[in-house]
Design a protein with these regions (language model features):
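Bacterial N-terminal signal peptides that target proteins for export
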Residues: 2-11
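Bacterial N-terminal signal peptides
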Residues: 10-19
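Transition segment at domain starts
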Residues: 23-52, 131
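Short amphipathic, basic-aromatic surface patches that mediate peripheral association
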Residues: 57-63
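A short beta-turn/strand-edge loop motif at beta-sheet boundaries
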Residues: 63-67, 105-106
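Beta-strand signatures of extracellular beta-sandwich domains
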Residues: 72-76
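An anionic, turn-rich surface loop/hairpin at beta-sheet edges
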Residues: 79-106
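Short, exposed beta-strand-loop hairpins at the edges of beta-sheets
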Residues: 99-125
Length: 131
């Protein structure tokens, strides 16, 4: 009986370890979108990663922030819900990365949106929604 209990304990610990490692490996991945397509944002891609427990989006070095009054980060989840995040342009430069809030459950698309003109400037998609 003791051997069975010990064997079950070892099995349970092994299963927990494997689950933890696979979860951590998934969070360490970098996911890249397709090329941005749109009237003003049509260069570069967006990348999603986790750093220090935070979900981050970054644009690639070849991405050009559109020269519009208020280019803004937007994400669309797998259900089609749109979330408006931060502006690309900030005083003294450009904001080429953004922290995705925890209430955004997954990301299917990344959009560049002009908040002033209320128009979509460009969009890119992940091959499958990232969490």
């Amino acid at each position: 009986m003791k051997q069975i209990n010990r064997l079950m304990s070892v099995f349970a610990l092994t299963a927990m370890f494997v689950a933890t490692v696979s979860y951590a490996a998934d969070k360490a991945d970098v996911h890249t979108t397709s090329m941005f397509q749109g009237p003003k944002a049509n260069t570069g891609t967006a990348m999603h990663t986790y750093e220090n427990g935070k979900s981050l989006l970054r644009v690639s070095p070849d991405f050009k922030v559109p020269d519009t009054p208020a280019p803004t980060w937007r994400v669309v989840d797998s259900k089609g819900t749109v979330y408006t995040l931060d502006a690309f342009k900030i005083k003294g430069g450009e904001k080429r990365e953004v922290t995705v809030p925890a209430y955004v459950k997954d990301i299917a698309k990344v959009q560049v949106y002009c908040a002033w003109a209320e128009v979509l400037l460009g969009e890119s998609s992940f091959p499958s929604a990232v969490k």
